[in-house]
Amino acid sequence: MSATLALTEQLIARASVTPDDQHCQQIMTERLTALGFECETIASHGVTNLWAVKRGTDGRDGKLLAFAGHTDVVPTGPLEQWSSPPFIPAHRDGKLYGRGAADMKTSLAAFVVASEEFVAAHPGHRGTIAFLITSDEEGPATDGTVKVVELLEARGERMDYCIVGEPTSTTELGDVVKNGRRGSMSGELVVKGVQGHIAYPHLAKNPIHLLAPALAELAAEQWDEGNEYFPPTTWQVSNLHAGTGASNVIPGHADLLFNFRFSTASTVEGLQARVHAILDKHGLEYTLKWSVSGLPFLTPRGELSGALENAIRTETGITTELSTTGGTSDGRFIARICPQVIEFGPPNGSIHKIDEHIEVRFVDPLKNVYRRVLEQLIA
């Protein structure tokens, strides 16, 4: 069994359902400390975070390449639906099964072993290797990576490159990497009306009827055209509720939850202003509460993307696709202190599902790609 596969199984065997790390980071710390890393545990409200650094011969003047990832996993779902226990690694038909196999314990193991091989081959490496690991990525993500980034900002610590080990591939290892993510902003809209008997509409004010024209306009709006890296911004309703449940009562208010997934072609302030303008144009009496869970970030083609593309092509023969599709990730926090952030990991077809798995044939090539990137950028 390869070193990467063995470490992956060791991590899967820890039932680290968010935010419980279950000593996964301790396993990693023991390996990294033996390599000469300085490891710091940063705890916050039940969340375990790890910041580990190994300086190269250039010291703080050298380039810093960080690997960011998470040890927490999503809940298993109904255990009886699993073909084998989710926290007992199992091999079937060339696949390794277990919760976290794809998201993202294989990536964690791969970068640890890649670092071990890199340091052994390049003991005098010039640049710095770092790990930023959290147990709060699958949960609220309020005490994990964002807290470590805030601490690093306060210390004046910088990163030059960061690989986030998210499972970005689709069918083959390396067919897709993420060089950015859209921003996410939600709104809670309450449109006020006047409750009354449905037989006497002149004595009431129906908020559903008032909202409908504005809702149609919001749904039809072209928010932007996207750009080279991002598709156009989207606006979607996730929840719409009004009424008491009775068939003879005009409701007193209508509640609408909606979400923007927005590109770098739009801003938070600009989108909010346009929504308010549409609501105001229709004369609505309303309250609107905004929440921004992440800003868009983008890493244009450059050193990190080039090194990763070269490594993937050398290892797999695949020409990778740079993409910004999908949901948010911890990359949105890291982009605040790192100009080049790219996500790359194994295929994601089984993540968060019953019988999550990874094809064993991808495990060591993933490690090799990570090692090749280290060799290109900080050797």
UniProtKB/Swiss-Prot annotation:
The record's listing under InterPro entries reads:
ArgE/DapE_CS, Bact_exopeptidase_dim_dom, DapE_proteobac, Peptidase_M20, Peptidase_M20_dimer, Peptidase_M20A
Per the UniProt entry, the disulfide pairs are: none
Its domain of life reads Bacteria
Its gene is dapE
Q: How is the cofactor bound?
A: Binds 2 Zn(2+) or Co(2+) ions per subunit.
* UniProt subunit comment: Homodimer.
- The protein here is known as Succinyl-diaminopimelate desuccinylase
Gene Ontology MF annotations: acetylornithine deacetylase activity; cobalt ion binding; succinyl-diaminopimelate desuccinylase activity; zinc ion binding
Looking at the keywords, is Metal-binding present? Answer: yes
Residues that hold Zn(2+) 2 according to the record? 103, 138, 352
Q: Which reaction does it catalyse?
A: N-succinyl-(2S,6S)-2,6-diaminopimelate + H2O = (2S,6S)-2,6-diaminopimelate + succinate
Family affiliation: Belongs to the peptidase M20A family. DapE subfamily.
Q: What EC number(s) does the entry state? A: 3.5.1.18
Q: Which UniProt keywords apply?
A: Amino-acid biosynthesis, Cobalt, Diaminopimelate biosynthesis, Hydrolase, Lysine biosynthesis, Metal-binding, Zinc
Instruction: Enumerate the residues binding Zn(2+) 1.
Output: 70, 103, 166
